Amino acid sequence: PGSGLRAQGEVPLASAEAQGQVAAYGDVMPSHSMPIEDYALLGDTGTAALVGRGGSIDWLCLPRFDSPACFAALLGSRENGRWLLGPVGRAVSTRRYLGDSFVLQTTHETSTGVVQITDFMPIGDGRADLVRMIEGVSGTVRIRHEWVVRFGYGKVRPWVSRRADTPQIGSGELISAIAGPDMLVLRGSRLPHAVDGRHEDEFDVAAGEHLTFSTTWFKSHHAVPPPIDVDDEVEQTVGRWEVWARSCDHSGPYREAVVRSLLVLRVLTHGGTGGIVAAPTTSLPEQFGGPRNWDYRFCWLRDASLTLEALLRSGYHEETVLWRNWLLRAVAGDPEDMQIMYAVDGGRELPERELSHLDGYAGSRPVRIGNAAVDQRQTDVMGEIMAALDLAREQGLEDTPESWSLQRALVANLARHWNEPDNGLWEIRGPLRHFTHSRVMVWVALDRAINAIERHGLKGPLERWRALRSTVRAEVMDRGYNVERGCFTQHYDTTEVDASLLLLPSVGFIADDDPRFLGTIRAVEQDLLRNGLVMRYRTQAGVDGLPGDEHPFLACSFWLVTAYAGAGRLEEAHALMHRLVALANDVGLLSEEYDPVGSRMVGNFPQAFSHLALIRAALALHEADSAHSEDTPS
């Protein structure tokens, strides 16, 4: 069904084999040997799962993005929980999302036949189901089925039993797994058998045969939910996603990548609360084998603000109310108590701890849950919030008296503390600094608050904020710009640069073609390019107080595209954009970082920040191309 990205991920089988997309998937193999880019995302706007190319679901948190995982093989082994449904032995596997959806169809070709497996999570029904459908296409294929449930991030073995389904709601048998408050049930055309604490099965699928399996989560003290109508749900799920995707009004050359990125933002946004998680995973490393492993399953105010902007600029006006309301609820209360991130439901307690029972992806330890950055001071966040709400006002999303009162209080608090050092955009765990990007975003917060008064008739201390805006700008120009290097600097006490400086024109602080910004682009190219991609900053400078290194940051590389476009370097902008879009995996997903030497994805996956930056870069290129066409004589 559908159109748009219908063929996304399809590769001729011979080509796939040449690219090495062949593996023995039924073997007992450590999940960390699978590259990050070999995973695809399933989601229902409540939580998400990662399924590998060979059919193993190695990561799933239920019932919410930030709940403990019940399948955690991604960060350990199959003994930490997974759900495998795939061919035994070698297979050439290709996959695609059906239309503009998150219904994944994988085709496995073996020496004896071809099967298709369709995986999806129904949306819009308020349940937590994961459905897998297998269909024989030709010949006969031997299939391996494993259902290994381990609650508590792969540590807790549940009490598992096989019993008759509740007569009133289903027929046949089901397998239930229960531990404390959580319960899963597996239904299917052919249930696996208990083997040493796991459930396993092998069977043949011939051409024309259809089998269906579903896993459902519910609270253990509740009644077992009824089975779903799989055929109806798959059709409705594809339809709902495609209706949402059609609202995108972007018409530039990168529309396909923009639509997929918007879909990623939507699936990572909780359908009930409106909070967007930075990624559905924790502890996928920034350096394989290293300690830079963080939990991204929470809602950063920055990401929420930038998502609001991306949606508004892509034609999603009605939908932005959900995001705005989460943002306003999250920051409600005493401005002194505002955090940089919250739980999906707006909760404030996100204590960071390490899970010693998990070996980590590719041996990268520690595995962390929670995030200590919750207690950091990141002054730039207020600028992102006010910029997003200003854009919403400009596009007709009016403030309520309560929302403007809250914004006034937040800006007033910022005015009292703006010149204090902070941890910055990159959540530096080293000493607090006066980061230049943070100071610029103070200016942005004041500028957008002033705009609300001048253009929209809202009430506030206009002259006081104007004076402070001028003071902040003068300080940034004096202390955040290095005359000798001819560029802005990472913070006031260094000559180093970081990639956040590429954002200065996009927030209106300086013109795209200002010599001071053009010098900053040159400094970023000189200091931060690694194999043509952009690092966040030089870790060798020791500013972040952490051991080890990291790889180029995909969002930063998209920011360079935006900077090139604004500076009129359109050929270079398009060349870099084409390269970056091609770094997405076969179903259009991006991680946090990319290793250009090893040609592999790095970091939590998929990463909202990377997809946000892609959207911004595509829009900037479209605007620059249009302006260039208008200026070019016919």
Predicted regions and their residues:
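Short linear motifs in low-complexity or flexible loops
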Residues: 12-18
